[in-house]
Amino acid sequence: MKKNIIALLLIMTLPAMAADEFTLYELLPPETHSFAITYDVTATREGAPFFFNPIRPGSVSTKERVIERSTGKELKFEVVSGKDAKATGWVQPETPDKAEFIKVYLPGPVPKGGETRIRIFKTYTDAVSYTLKDGQLVFTRPLGIKRNVVVLPKGWELIECASPGIVSIDPDGRIRVSFLNDRDDQLPVKIVARRLP
């Protein structure tokens, strides 16, 4: 029985190890309605000179920074409209003109069979997704990436999680909730927390 459980756990982790995209959400004090995002992704489209990371509608993005993960080198980027992104030919033609993207300048075009691993740092402010309600922290956000981690601010404890997640504690005492989105659509995440006494 114990061997079966271990085998099942190993099988369940295989997609997570094989998956490439990963997003870390570090919730800042809820009064700020802000959370720091670290997004790891690999550009694999042959010949691509850029990588376009959409800025979610309703969120205000600040403190952007991009590095190449293999070297740690800072990469040039700019925020562009959907119209400007479409003009490059590297985003879908049906992208709305008013959409916003972080346009990352890759070190060189992605070679055939190659890749460029990048890490995007940004801070979102979004009072709809992240707020303080009746003294409780509420984070509600659909997550489309396969692997996601949400870290609560220090001094808060989890009291509700609407989607299956693995709860653990960081070395600094912050609570983290890890999600594996095995769906073909977005995982509806809702986290509620309260201040520790």
Language-model region placement:
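A surface-exposed beta-strand-loop module
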Residues: 63-66, 70-137, 171-197
